[in-house]
Regions:
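Residues forming the ATP-binding cleft of Hanks-type serine/threonine protein kinase domains
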Residues: 23
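Acyl-donor (CoA/ACP) binding surface of acyl/acetyltransferases
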Residues: 1-18, 28-29, 66-181
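Sparse recognition of residues in long alpha-helices and their boundaries
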Residues: 35-36, 63, 158
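Conserved GNAT-fold acetyl-CoA-binding loop/helix
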Residues: 29-53
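A short helix-loop-beta-strand connector motif used in the catalytic cores of GNAT acetyltransferases and
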Residues: 53-67, 77
Length: 181
């Protein structure tokens, strides 16, 4: 699939339903393989409330910042950062919503297009990512993107996760500027 059919943009109100559908209509086993503790999931309305809040906040105020991924102008996934320390660092997440679009290398291309938004708008010096160590796809993507593997350890990486082994990856602004995406 050519990169000409791929684009990215900041989240809009029209994205809240399909993004929520991804989380609330996905197979529970898929979510567990990603490291989600289903008992920690907020309600759909609470989830939508968090997304709506993000839309009304300045970059400096955001607790999460989401970029929507489009294939032929249709939303097919997203990436967001959270655990944001504005002007310093944030933690990256990446999600392709439909299983038909997974394992095609789209995530790699989309993240390359997304990273400038995070570095520029959040004024970041470093982006970290801590995928579930037993989920190979995002770990392979981080390596291919030029993120540096720092360590593997056990933690609860997010508010909807169970305790799990994660791989901690980092990409500094300096290294990002050197990469020729």
């Amino acid at each position: 699939m050519g990169s000409a059919s791929l684009s990215v943009r900041e989240i809009q109100h029209s994205d809240i339903e399909p993004l929520s559908d991804y989380w609330f209509n996905s197979d529970p086993d898929f979510l567990i393989r990603m490291g989600v503790d289903l008992s920690k999931m907020p309600t759909r309305e609470e989830w939508k409330g968090m997304l709506n809040e993000q839309l009304s906040q300045s970059y400096e105020e955001k607790k999460s910042y989401c970029i929507i991924w489009l294939l032929k102008d249709e939303p097919v996934g997203h990436s967001n950062v959270n655990r944001i320390i504005f002007g310093e660092e944030a933690y990256l997440h990446l999600h392709i919503w439909d299983s038909d679009n997974r394992t095609k290398g789209l995530g790699l291309q989309f993240v390359k297009m997304t990273l400038p938004f995070f570095f520029q708008n959040m004024k970041l010096k470093k982006i970290c990512c801590e995928p579930y160590a037993l989920n190979p796809a995002p770990n392979k993507t981080m390596e291919k993107l030029g993120f540096e593997f720092i360590k593997e350890y056990i933690t609860v990486p997010g508010f909807i996760n169970f305790e799990q082994p994660v791989k901690h990856w980092e990409l500094t602004l300096e290294k990002f500027r050197q990469l020729n995406y």
